[in-house]
Amino acid sequence: MTDAAAVIERVRQRVDPTPAERRALAAAASRLTERAEAAIAELPVAADVVQVGSTARGTWVAGDRDIDLFVRFPSDLPREQLETYGTTVGAAVLPDGHEEYAEHPYVTGTFEGYAVDLVPCYDVAAATEIKSAVDRTPFHTTYLQEHLDDGLAADVRLCKQFLKGIGVYGSDLRTQGFSGYLCELLVVEYGGFEAMLAAIEDWQPPVVIDPAAHQQASFDDPLVVVDPTDPERNVAAVVSAANVATVQHHARRFRATPSEDAFTPASPAPLDAAALRSHIDRRDTTPLAVVLDAPDVVADQLYPQLYRSRDGVVRGLREHGFDVVRAAAWADERAVVFVELASAELPAVERHVGPPVSVGTHAERFYETYADDDGVYGPFVDDDGRYVVERDRDVRTAGGFARTELGTVALGARIESRVASGDYDVYVGDAVVEALLPEFESELAAYVDPKA
Amino acid sequence: MTDAAAVIERVRQRVDPTPAERRALAAAASRLTERAEAAIAELPVAADVVQVGSTARGTWVAGDRDIDLFVRFPSDLPREQLETYGTTVGAAVLPDGHEEYAEHPYVTGTFEGYAVDLVPCYDVAAATEIKSAVDRTPFHTTYLQEHLDDGLAADVRLCKQFLKGIGVYGSDLRTQGFSGYLCELLVVEYGGFEAMLAAIEDWQPPVVIDPAAHQQASFDDPLVVVDPTDPERNVAAVVSAANVATVQHHARRFRATPSEDAFTPASPAPLDAAALRSHIDRRDTTPLAVVLDAPDVVADQLYPQLYRSRDGVVRGLREHGFDVVRAAAWADERAVVFVELASAELPAVERHVGPPVSVGTHAERFYETYADDDGVYGPFVDDDGRYVVERDRDVRTAGGFARTELGTVALGARIESRVASGDYDVYVGDAVVEALLPEFESELAAYVDPKA
């Protein structure tokens, strides 16, 4: 047995559900389906029940206890009735459940220890004719049931555990990683987990995979996996370039040096104040933190806004002449944009380059603007023949930037409104330590020990 | 009379030689020519004497007292004999003169208060057949005598005084400005001084002027004036882009607001230590000076080496992460590369971006280099999917850079050898003040009051 095979065998023992687990889940799903069918029989409309998701496909990782049931209504049913009937069936199946809302309401609850979602959808003829995103899901299950066998399903479990271990599993907008469906398609595409790793090692982004050979749209993403049920959809649309690279890195590492580590999420020891101070001293940088109460929105809204804000703050600082070493954004009770700067203070003057002297009116206007201004050095002519002045900076400190200029940078909507009302705090240098610990002790631990 | 005409009239009174000055100069030139012809008569070879330069063309500025005589020998005369005969004639004409050496020796001395150069050259059929650069000069004089009249010659004097006033007169490699011959061609081309200013105001570099409409080479210069005596030569080759822009700036200023100031070189009051410190405080920058004894070479060798060294030091500092606000290079007894920095100190770590993870062997090698190095942060993967480490900087201070890294940057040859032997000093911050004053008090005065 190769090293890789031995490692994989040990991982299989962790991720493969036991026969008892399978039987229990199948029995629970069956009882739920019967309940749903009984409720449907009471309705003045025909509908059927399909089990979807990883537990329908046999690709769930041992210990996962999610059952997803979709109730398919005729596609000509008005939306309000679909919602009403769906809620009615949901309440009958999960009397202790509650409604949640995606594109339309669905019912979520627990049943015999399983987390159950009961989702109404339209029974359309093809995934390309869907009326709502959830209508597509049954087609995914059908496609995979046709293409997966027990061996591939087991390899999907390995793949999921691998991606969890390296921190890129999940198509939520915080992770920007790989969905379960994407794992399934990749394992099917390459014919197994190890073959998939071998293929990933050679990826040259942008990578395009089209299992059904029917791509009809072009995608500007580092990884494109055309949905076999919809030629215009990239299943990997949310996967970031960094996560594509991370998978590639770990595929290469695992193949060179197989280890169970890749299948185990890192959990760095939380960082205490002394350790954080020691890193800041060692790096001799200046940290800046913009801190606010986390906006009360779901994670898939919060994180894109937070990342956009981080990028906006970094861009703004750079445009003002600050040298950013690294930046991050985190959320817990509070949300934080954390920026590490080479220096938190700039000279009093900045070089302001104007137009080439040769551009006539425009150049003349620049010259006239500054010619009689005793507060600037110049205008003079640079080596390229452009007018230049050295003028006083508006903003000389990173803290000053964060306190007065955040309104000028691109921020996420809910963060922008907080900033507009001054409802945020700015910390610079050592003050950052007390401000962020212990709330962000895990995030800071990862920050000071960054890994591929 | 327009404002411009009134200003120009006053300048003419300063720059036009008086009839007495003209007569005296013509008489002196005539006597020198007779002496030279007498000496030639003693030689076993035929030759003639031509007066060249601005005093031959009537374009000299009042007070200039230069007479240039060229002795033209047959083009088949061996070079050693040309040199011997030239020196013989020179010694006869200027018994108190001494030899200098350009492409070949010539004699320079004084005669009745005039500075006289007596230069041997070959009498070739056309400027394109020259054997040495000086052979071209008589053709320039012939061309201009055909194209200049008294009015244009007077406007050439205005042009020269204007370019002197704004600091761009002289084709030496320190100034990188306009030669007298170039002034003459421009005034002829545009038909007068004011017409020239009007044309310059509209220049869109690169500007190409070809008086004889015979250009045969292409030139990568911001200003091209094809020599009417040589289709492959750009008379304006040494003029820098900055000087083209400077002329354009002042042409525009003069036409908008005529003033005699443009015809008067600026002479800023020398800067004392208190004033320099006050500027440094006000700008809140850190000055750095690399100082050495000026290499003992002529200015046309020294300044290109000095400018190259300045550019090399600036590039090196930037490559090491320093933010350079402005830089300069000056020479007197000592030579100095002066650099003004936003900050003289950088963080302990620097971001070192490696290859994209996807590039296989190259990426793997980068990862392996740092994977087990406890001294770095990372390797991790950046947003673009590249490996990154944050590693300790080799050089954290600008002074350290100047003391240990100058050998790694492009320097002028004679400065490079000084640096190689450690024969230079580095000053940072306030120490620069005492180190550079009073020797560079004028240069520093101009530096802290930069003008177009």
From Swiss-Prot, chains A, B:
Transmembrane segments: none annotated. Mg(2+) binds at residues 66, 68, 117. A single active site specifically recognizes both ATP and CTP and is responsible for their addition. Belongs to the tRNA nucleotidyltransferase/poly(A) polymerase family. Archaeal CCA-adding enzyme subfamily. Pfam families: CAA_C, NTP_transf_2, tRNA_NucTransf2. Catalyzes the addition and repair of the essential 3'-terminal CCA sequence in tRNAs without using a nucleic acid template. Adds these three nucleotides in the order of C, C, and A to the tRNA nucleotide-73, using CTP and ATP as substrates and producing inorganic pyrophosphate. tRNA 3'-terminal CCA addition is required both for tRNA processing and repair. Also involved in tRNA surveillance by mediating tandem CCA addition to generate a CCACCA at the 3' terminus of unstable tRNAs. While stable tRNAs receive only 3'-terminal CCA, unstable tRNAs are marked with CCACCA and rapidly degraded. Keywords: ATP-binding, Magnesium, Metal-binding, Nucleotide-binding, Nucleotidyltransferase, RNA repair, RNA-binding, Transferase, tRNA processing. One of its GO terms (molecular function) is CCA tRNA nucleotidyltransferase activity. InterPro entries: CAA_C, CCA-adding_arc, CCA_tRNA_nucleotrans_2, NT_2-5OAS_ClassI-CCAase, NT_sf, NuclTrfase_I-like_C, Polymerase_NTP_transf_dom, tRNA_NucTransf2. GO terms for biological process: RNA repair; tRNA 3'-terminal CCA addition. Its cofactor is Mg(2+). It is an enzyme of class 2 (transferase). The gene is cca. HAMAP family: CCA_arch. Its EC number is 2.7.7.72. This is CCA-adding enzyme. The keyword DNA damage does not apply. SUPFAM superfamilies: Nucleotidyltransferase (SSF81301), PAP/Archaeal CCA-adding enzyme, C-terminal domain (SSF55003), PAP/OAS1 substrate-binding domain (SSF81631). The lineage of its organism: Archaea, Methanobacteriati, Methanobacteriota, Stenosarchaea group, Halobacteria.
